[in-house]
A protein has these predicted regions:
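Long, charge-rich alpha-helical interaction segments
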Residues: 116-121, 138
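Short polybasic/polar patches that bind polyanions
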Residues: 48, 88, 104, 173, ...
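Active-site neighborhood of HAD-like aspartate-dependent phosphohydrolases
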Residues: 61-108
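C-terminal cap/substrate-recognition subdomain and adjoining C-terminal extension
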Residues: 128-273
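Short coil/turn segments at secondary-structure boundaries
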Residues: 98-102, 114, 146
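Cytosolic catalytic headpiece of P-type ATPases
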Residues: 109, 119, 126-128
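Non-catalytic pre-domain segments flanking phosphatase-related domains
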Residues: 1-71
Length: 273
């Protein structure tokens, strides 16, 4: 038998679950059930109907056992897609947003689509970085709840983003991440050239960076957690000990041990012991 952890989006007594199950209510919104894979498959429609997220573990993990968390930034740590917001402020929003959505769904080559979107920034003042941070970008609700749980366990945390380094640096400092890694747009005379410089932070880079950081810290891959939402996060999710899909695109869900559809960071630590 495996351990099924159920987290509801609102307070509940879990009375909607079959009486045949031995349900152990842990908090006002979470419960644990010992069940088989087939039981879990049968429960999925019921849990979806009651706006519950759930994860099945052979052995339920302890949060204290994890020493490194790698998080995507756009639509994972923050609510927005940074380049979409920058493009909107620069007057090319609709064009760029459509390409971003297809790239995150895995329908387009990531590098080609990113370079095409970055090209639309040519000639735009680089002060747009500061403007988008102040005027547009919003942190995901209850992010600090999750980060505080990590702090209690002295867990290292890093941001790995296909976004841009100055924006990542802002959130690294604001939320006390250990480090942040992202792409860089070339700037000349205070304006974007429409090109990228340095190593591309794509899907394979994200996985390599997680693995390299763990190695440098003497942490086993089994002691890592990765959190992401888009197709470019899949290799990173596959590398980690526990993969979390944060309101993920459909292509991401099969690779996630925990999928947050109905809940968010206020609930993530409830899946662990």
């Amino acid at each position: 038998m495996s351990s099924l952890v159920i987290v509801a989006s609102t307070d509940t007594d879990f009375g909607f679950l079959p009486e045949s199950l031995n349900v152990v209510r842990e908090t006002s919104r979470s419960a644990a059930v010992e069940c088989s894979q087939s039981d879990w498959e049968e429960l999925k429609p019921l849990l979806e109907a009651h706006a519950c997220d759930a994860a099945l573990f052979d052995v339920r993990p302890k949060l204290a056992d994890f020493k490194l968390v790698a998080m995507d930034m756009d639509a994972t740590t923050i609510c927005n897609e940074t380049l979409d917001e920058m493009a909107d402020m620069a007057g090319v929003g609709q064009e760029v947003k459509a390409v971003t959505e297809r790239a995150m769904l895995g329908e387009l080559d990531y590098e080609a689509s990113l370079r095409a979107r970055v090209a639309t920034m040519k000639g735009v003042a680089a002060t747009l970085y500061e403007d988008v941070i102040v005027e547009r970008l919003q942190v995901q609700p209850a992010l600090q709840t999750w980060l505080s749980a990590l702090d209690e366990n002295n867990t290292h945390r890093i941001l790995i983003s296909g976004g841009f380094q100055p924006v990542v640096d802002h959130f690294v400092e604001a939320f006390d991440f250990d480090a942040g890694f992202a792409n860089r747009m070339t700037i000349e005379d205070g304006r974007f050239t429409g090109e990228l410089e340095g190593e591309l932070v794509d899907s394979s880079y994200k996985a390599r960076r997680l693995e390299a950081t763990a190695l440098a810290l003497g942490i086993e891959r089994s002691q890592t957690i990765a959190i992401g939402d888009g197709a470019n996060d899949i290799p990173m999710l596959k590398t980690a000990g526990i993969a979390v899909g944060y309101h993920p695109k459909p292509a991401v869900e099969p690779y996630a041990d925990i999928v947050l559809r109905h809940t968010g960071y206020e609930s993530l630590s409830l899946f662990f012991k």
